[in-house]
Amino acid sequence: QIIKRNKSFNSELDQSQSHIRAQQARQREQDMKLKRAYGTSKTAAMKRDELLKNYNKQIALQQRQLKQIQKDRIMFKRQEMEHFRKGQAIPNDLKDRLNYNMQNITNIKKNIESLQSDYRNTQTQYATIINRLETLE
């Protein structure tokens, strides 16, 4: 019989590989979570499409509201110019409407930017999820 000698235990090598093994374990755990959450890449793609469709609807609604508020602003500005031409003082009510209108325009623009950012983030998140699920399939 031939007895083969094993290499001696190298603690430095084991310690350097422990980081890699821990990273691989985390990756396997994340993969299992993805599999439980979505099952297949097609399911994840459907979920992504549904979310993006909802974002598009919200963005379209915000844009319609913005157009309406901008039309209101034009009307308020015309009223302001009419008072100015007549040499009358601009009523406080009209000044308040203009200020409130401007705040609404600013808020809606911020909402649109936020929704567009969320849309892009959702696209990138689901792209990585779908790619990972495709490699697992």
Identify the meaning behind each predicted range.
Residues 65-80:
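Extended, amphipathic, non-transmembrane alpha-helical segments
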Residues 41-67:
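Short, charge/polar-rich alpha-helical segments
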Residues 78-137:
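Charged, long alpha-helical assembly modules
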Residues 1-46:
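Short, cationic interaction patches enriched in Lys/Arg with P/S/T/G and frequent prolines
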